[in-house]
Amino acid sequence: MHKSVNVTYYLLSLLLLFTIASNCSGQSVDTKEFLPANDSLKGKLLFVTECHEVRTNYSEYQSVISKITANFTASDTLNIFLEAPFTLSHFINQYISGKNRILIDSILRNDPYKIEFYFSIKKLKKNIRFIAVDFEYDQGNPGGRFESYKLYFEELKNVLANSNIDLSVIKSFIYGIKVQGLEETDFYTFKKYIQKLSVNQSDPILKNKLKESNFVLAALQTREKPDVRDKAYYNRMQELLNAGISIAENMNLMIFGSAHGNPYNEKCLYHKLNYADDSPFKNKVKIFANVYISCLSYGSYNAKSIVLETVGLYYGSKEDKQILDLVLKNYKPEIENSFTIVRNTFQSDLKDVDKVLYWGIHYKVK
């Protein structure tokens, strides 16, 4: 019985990957100008600005990560900071290290493009660590944040069970996640419970898990304004890095939506990372700015699909049209459904264009 189910699952997985490959085969991807080995990026941060839900984004990131890690030795690590909750990065890291398949079997089961992306990262077999500290739970709205949050506390329940701790409190909390919905007082009460369990805890596995859970519960639980989210992300990222994540000797990549990367917005994440006195990346941020020319953006971030005509770096600002005209003046895309990396040689008085290493040009992507 189990063998039959496993064979069926394997065949369905192959069919899924074949379907994705067929859908992506029409894409033209040109990354020959991306030469990370020549850019002295170790200890710096390559900040990638994106507009969400464009099909070539995943082809881009797969190519970029493959090139960055191509000559890695066993002592090298790539840190990838995502616009995502900690609980999602927790399961991403488990999957790419071969520990379990919760990421693709549950959290991303309806998103074949992301499944293919993480499958390709796993196949690289390199030291890659995903780091994410954005808001969690999202008030129970359907999607990856809700799913990863729910599964994270199911995992905590199993850890508590292995330590013979009464499960009534955590079962009630999980019920609230799944069915009832959680209020601010629920988070506060459960966080106090976790802190109480941590006192004088001698089991190192349980102690570390409780500490991690406390960090998860301290996150924003709703989609706040970008400046509120960015401040929280920056502070929580600092907390993780101070706990022992090395960046100075490693390569560091950050992939974030354009609203968080505008150099003219002093409250955005990019500005904090490159200019704040307490930033570990102060004056060490390089920009990889994505450009979208007549590209379709799907799904979850928009009420409906929209066509993008923008440079992600200045999206939504008055500078966007100026930088888009500059890009098109210097580079004329010809192949539809294409992505091309172009090394920045453009001259402009717009802020921080001189910090752009690469333009990632997406052209007529459907």
PLM region spans:
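Compositional signal for N-terminal targeting/processing segments
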Residues: 24-366
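Bacterial Sec-dependent N-terminal signal peptides
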Residues: 1-34
